[in-house]
Amino acid sequence: MVFGELMSSAGDSGPGYVLNDFDAVPRLSYARSIDIRDSLSDLIRIQRDSYDAFIGIDEGSSGGIQSIFQSMFPIRDPLGRAVLEFVSCNIGEPQYDEYECIKRGITFSVPMRITLRFVVWKVQEVSFKEVKYVVDEGTLERSVKYMKEQEVSIGDLPMMTSYGTFIINGIERVIVSQMHRSPGVFFDSDKGKTYSSGKLIYSARIIPYRGSWLDFEFDIKDIIYFRIDKKRKLPVTYLLKALGMSNNDILDTFYDKVLYVRSDKGWKVPFVVDRFKGVRLSYDLMDVDGNVLIKANTRITLRIAKKLYADGLREYLVPFAGISGLFVATDLVDPASGAVIVSAGEAIAAEHIVKLELFDISEIAFLNIDFLTVGPYVLNTLFLDRHITQEDALFEIYRVLRSGESPNLEAVKSFFKGLFFEPDRYDLSVVGRIKLNSHLRLDIDENLTVLTKDDIVHVIKKLVLLRDGEGVVDDIDHLGNRRVRSVGEFIENQFRVGILRLERMIMDYMSSVNFDNAVPCDFVNPKILATVLKDFFSSSQLSQFMDQTNPLSEVTHKRRLSALGPGGLTRERAGFEVRDVHPTHYGRICPIETPEGQNIGLISSLAIYAKINKYGFIESPYRKVIDGVVTDSVEYLLATQESDYYIADAGAALDENNRFVDDMLYCRHGGNFVMVKREDVNYIDVSPKQIVSVAASLIPFLENNDANRALMGSNMQRQAVPLLKAEAPLVGTGMESVVAAGSGAVVLAKRDGVLHRVDRVLYPVIRAFDKNKDSILVLIYTTEKVQRSNHNTCINQRPIVKIGDYVRTNDVIADGAAIDRGELALGKNVLVAFMSWQGCNFEDSIVISSDVVKRDVFTSIHIEEFECVVRDTPLGPEKIMRSVPDVNEESLSHLDDVGIVNIGAEVSAGSVLVGKVTPRPPVSLPPETKLLVTIFGEKVFDCVDSSLYLPPDVEGTVIDVHVFVRRGVEENDRSLLIKQSEVNSFRKERDYEIDVVSEYFYDELKKLLCSADLPLNGHADVESLLAAKSLEALWEIGLSNPKISAKVADMKGKFDELITEAHSKFDQKIDKLNYGYDLPQGVLTIVKVFVAVKHNLQPGDKMAGRHGNKGVISRIVPVEDMPHLEDGTPVDIILNSLGVPSRMNIGQILETHLGWAAVNLGHRVGRMLDSGEEEGPVVERIRSFLSEVYEGQKLKEDVASMSDEALLKFANRLRRGVPMAAPVFEGPKDAQISRLLELADVDPSGQVDLYDGRSGQKFDRKVTVGYIYMLKLHHLVDDKIHARSVGPYGLVTQQPLGGKSHFGGQRFGEMECWALQAYGAAYTLQEMLTVKSDDTSPGRRPRVPYSESYYIKGDSNFECGIPESFNVMVKELRSLCLDVVLKHDKEFTSSNVE
C-alpha cells in the first residue's frame, strides 16, 4: 500500500482558497504527526467485508453461498438409482427498500433460488448389495432414464443494509463480531496450582473449527494421557496404537538411538557435545585408549565439552557395567536360540550384563534417555500396558466415548476415523491448519483440514520437549491465538446447519419417493433454511438490537468485539487474565473502551486503524522504516509478526527528509520497550491515536485523564442524546468529521456535480446531476425527516447545500442527527465555572442557568411509537370508529371522522389516539336498566372500548400516522388519504427528475443547433428563434447538416431513455404501494401513531463531559442569580471543583482553558469586524491576526491566499469561536495554551473574577471559567420517575410487580424497616407493613386514617389487616411441613391500645 491521502482539516489549499458554506470551519490542529486517511474512510468495513465474502462478491473468495451448495451436492439415492445435482444459485433483488421494510415491519431480504438437476438412471436389477445399471453402448456410460432441471426457491436471505445493519421484522439489528480462541494447537501448564508440590503439569489441546477436541496432558507421575471431548483419560499410547503404530514404531519416533560397540576395555560410544551439557559423570571419562580425561563425579559444562571435542575426542569408553540402567532400543536376541534377552524399552539390569558377555553381543542400540535433557515419559506410558494391540486400543477408545454399546471391529474403525480424519465430521479450517503448521513446523497443504498422524505425533513430541525444559507454553490471550468471527462467518455457519437439515430431508424423501414423477421442487422445503436463519437473527446472543442513540453509538456497536456468545466465554467463568489488556492489543483493540460492569474486558472495541484479514486475525498498520528513514509505504502486521520487529512511536522526531533526528529511540519489541539505534528500527506507528477506538479518539486531552475516567468518557459519549440544534465542539480532536462521514448518519455525494434543486419542505430530497462521460446522470438523494430511531431519539437530516453549489464525491450534502456541517456534534459548548454554589453542586451535582433552558440549548426531541392492532375476533371484527362508548366528546375531539388522531394534534396522558371497539357477547340487562333504556332511549352498546390511549408519562405532538390495511380488506378514508399523499410524493419526485433532464437537454440542444445552418424565418438571430421554441419543438426542427442531425438523434435517444426510466421507477413504486400489506393471521388493520415529545432540561437529568465528569442536575437557578463575568455575561453551568482532583481527569480543565481561548479569539475577530477603519484596514488586521493565531499551521498559508471577500466571510464564521483540534496524545502544551490566551486578551492563567448574581459582589478569589463541551445523556428524569397506587400483582406470590415498565410498586425492604425501628416510629412502621402494604383483596382494605370514612363518617379507628407478604411466608413454611396458625385475640385491637 502506498501512503494514502494525508489528513488535512484545512481543506483545499493554494491561491484563492475559499471555504464553502456547507463545509465546517477548519480546526487549529496541534497534531505533530502525519496521519493516513484511507484507513479511516469506512469505519463499518468490518461488517460489510465479512458479509460480502459470504455472499461471494469478493473476487477469489473461497467461501460464499455457491461453495456451500457445491459441498452439499450431489445427493444420491441410498441405492444409487438417482442423483440430485446442483447447477447454479441465483440471488434476487429485494422487493422493498430499507425504509419501506422498517415502515412495514418486515425483514429486508432477497429471494434465493437454486437450479437443481434430478437424474434417474436406468437399472437392470436392484439388490441390497449392488445396483446393475443399463450401459449405453455408444458412450459406455450409464443410461439416463429421466432428467429434469428446475429452479427451486429455498427461502429468503436477510440482506445487509448499506449501513452494516440488518432489518429483521422492521427493527434494525447488528451482528456483533466475536473474539474466540483460534483453531489450532495450544500448549499450556497449570502454573503449579494443581498439586501442593508446585510441580508444573503440562498439557496440549488441539481445537478444531468443528469436531472433537483432543487433549494431551501429563500427570503427577509424568505419564502422558489423552482425552477426547473431555471424557475419561487414556494413556497416549492407546491413541498411537489406534493409529497403527507398534511398540518399536513408538520408540523409534520419540527417541534417538545411541550405538554402543563392545571393545576390550569397555563400550565405545560416539562423543556428542550436547549430550554432556550439565552432566555429572558417574564414571571416569576415558578415550578409546583408556586414558582418563575427566574424573568421576565431575560436572561437565558446555565449555568443557566443546574443548574436548576440539581436542579431537570423537569416541569415549563406558565401562562394561556402565550400561546398567540404560534402555535398549530394540529386542536383544540370543543369536543361537533366538530367545529375547532384553525386550525393547527395558532397562539393562545386572543379570542382563552377565548374559550379554555370555552370548558375546558386540553392539547394542540404546535409547537416548539421560533423565536430564530427555526423559522416559513416552516409554513409561508405553509400559503401562505394552501388550495391547491396535484392535484393543480402538475398542477401548470406543468404550470411553460410547459406553454401553457393543459394535463390531469395522464400526469401531469407522467411528475412530470419523473423529479426526473425515472432513464431514472434523474440520480444522484453513486457519487451524496454518496455525498447526506454524506451531509444529510442518509443511502440510493448507486445504487439508483434518488431522494427520504426523500432527498428533508432533504435538506429543513438543509436549515432551516442554516437560524436558525446552520451549515455552502459549499465551492464550495473545492475539495471535485469538481470532474474530464476523457476521459473514456466523451466517455461513447457520447456512450450513440449514443445508445439512435440508440434506437429511432430501435423503429421507429419496428413500420413499417414486422417481418416475418426481421433480426437483418435490425434494426441497424452503422453510427449513429460512427457519434456521430467522432463529439466529432473532434469538442469538450476538444478534443485538442496534444502539441508535446517536451516530457514535451506531459506529461503536458495529465495531464491537465480544468474547461472549456461542462458543465463547461466560462472564461468570472468565478470569482476570482474559479480561486484562495484553501487549498485542496495541493498535488492534482499544485498551480504554469497555463496559464498567461484569462484562469488563470481555466486550471491547476495534482500534481505529485496525482491520481484520481473511483469516479473522486483527492487523495493525505501520509505516516502513529503511536505514533510519521513514517511507510512505504502509504495511499491516499481525500480532505474531510484529513481535520480531523494532517499532518506533509515531511521535518520534523526524527531519525534513523523514529521517529520525535522534540516534537512539525507544521501540517496542517482543512486548517490551527497548532502546535501539535508529538504523535498527523496522517500522513506525502510523498515528499516535492508532491504539484507541473511535469513541476514545473523540476525547481531547485523553492523555491527561485517569484511565477509569477515560473509560467512562468514551462510554458516556455513546449515551448522548441528539439535541434540537446540533453544535460541533469548539475543542475537538479532528476525528469529528471522520466519524460523521463513516457513521452513515449524513448524506454523502455519490458523484461530482452541481446542485440543481433542493426541496426542503414538500419532499425531503436533494437532486443533483452529473455528466457521466457523454450522458447525464440525475441523482436523487432521499433524506430522513423526523424519523424514530431504535432508542426513540429523533433522526432528522437537513440539506446544508444550496442550488448552484459544486460538490465533490463523498462531500457531505445533508447533516443528520447530532451532526453539524459534517462534524459529529453530540452536545453543546457552554460557559462553565468551577466553584461551589450554596451546596447545590455537592457530590457531582450540577447547577444550571435558567437561560440555558429558555434558549433550548439542551432541549431534545424524542419520538414515541404507539401501535393499535385491529383483529378479527370470533364475535366479529374489531372496528376503528370515532363514536367510542363511555368516552366523552372532549377526549375524542382530536380524532378524525375515521377515528384516528389528526397529525399535529397536541396529546397528553390519557388522550385517545385511535378509537376502537371490540365486540362482546350479548348480556341480559336487569329490569331497572331496561326501564331506563325504554324511558330515555339510550343506546345499548354490544361492544367494549378497546381504544389506544396515550400512556401516563407521555405528552407531545402527533407527527405521523401509518395505516396498514390487510390486502383484500376494504380501506378506510384515512388510509386512502395517506396512500394518495405518497402517490403525490412519488409523482413530484418523477416530475423533478424529468425537469432536470429536460432542462439539461434543452440547453445542450440549443448549443448544438446554434452551430447549425437554420432558416431564420424573420427572427433577428438563431438564438432568438430557438428561445421561442419548446424542447419538443426543438426535436422536430429539420436540419440539412447530416452530422448534426445524427447528434440530435443520438441525444433524442438518450433523452427518451432517461424519461422512460423515470416513468418506470414511478410505476414500480405505485405497484408496490397498491400491492397492499401482508399482515399476521387474524389482523385486519394496524395503525401506528408517532408522537414527538419535547424534553427540556430539568432537575434529575444526567449530564456529562467527555472526560468522565458526570453529574445530575440539582437545581435550575434564575439567570439573574447566576455568577457573571465582569461584562455581565452569566455562567451557564457551575461544576464542583472538588470533583477534579480525586478523579484525576485533568483533561476537562485543559479543555476549559482552550475553549476559553477559542471563544475569546472569536470575540476578538468579531470586534475587528465590527470596528471601523480608524485603526487601519479591517481586512489586513484580520489577516495579520489570523496569521498569528494559525502560526506554524497549514491554515496560515490558506489565510494568506484568501481574497478579501473570502477572508471576511471566513472571519465571520469565526465569531462564535476558533475551532481547535487536540488529537489524542498530541494535545497542546501549557505554553501553547497560554500563548492563545494572551492572543485572546485574557488572563493567561485561565481564571477570571466572577461576581455573585444575587449580591453583585465579587468573589474573593478568581475562578476557573471556560467553555466545555457538555452532553445530555439519555438517562432522563421523565423516563425514571414513577408512582403507583394500585397496580398489577404477581400470580404466585401476590406481590406487586417491580419497575416502571410493569407499573410496579416501591419496595419497603428490611433495611428501611430497620431505619424506622431505629427512630422508634412504631405506628409508621405498622402503617408501612399493613395499611400501605400489598393487600390484594379490595373487600378487606383497611380503613386508612384521613380517608373518606375519617372525614365524612368521623370514624378514626385505625384497623389493619394481614399483609399478603405474611401469607406468602406462612405458605412457604407450610411447604416445609411447618403448620403455622394465627390466633386472633379479640380483646387486643388498635382502637383500645393506649
From Swiss-Prot:
Pfam families: RNA_pol_Rpb2_1 (PF04563), RNA_pol_Rpb2_2 (PF04561), RNA_pol_Rpb2_3 (PF04565), RNA_pol_Rpb2_45 (PF10385), RNA_pol_Rpb2_6 (PF00562), RNA_pol_Rpb2_7 (PF04560). The keyword Transferase applies. It is an enzyme of class 2 (transferase). One of its GO terms (biological process) is DNA-templated transcription. The gene is rpoB. The keyword Nucleotidyltransferase applies. HAMAP family: RNApol_bact_RpoB (MF_01321). This is DNA-directed RNA polymerase subunit beta. GO terms for cellular component: DNA-directed RNA polymerase complex. It catalyses: RNA(n) + a ribonucleoside 5'-triphosphate = RNA(n+1) + diphosphate. SUPFAM superfamilies: beta and beta-prime subunits of DNA dependent RNA-polymerase. Keywords: DNA-directed RNA polymerase, Nucleotidyltransferase, Transcription, Transferase. The RNAP catalytic core consists of 2 alpha, 1 beta, 1 beta' and 1 omega subunit. When a sigma factor is associated with the core the holoenzyme is formed, which can initiate transcription. DNA-dependent RNA polymerase catalyzes the transcription of DNA into RNA using the four ribonucleoside triphosphates as substrates. Belongs to the RNA polymerase beta chain family. It comes from Anaplasma phagocytophilum (Ehrlichia phagocytophila). GO terms for molecular function: DNA binding; DNA-directed RNA polymerase activity; ribonucleoside binding. It comes from the Bacteria. Its EC number is 2.7.7.6.
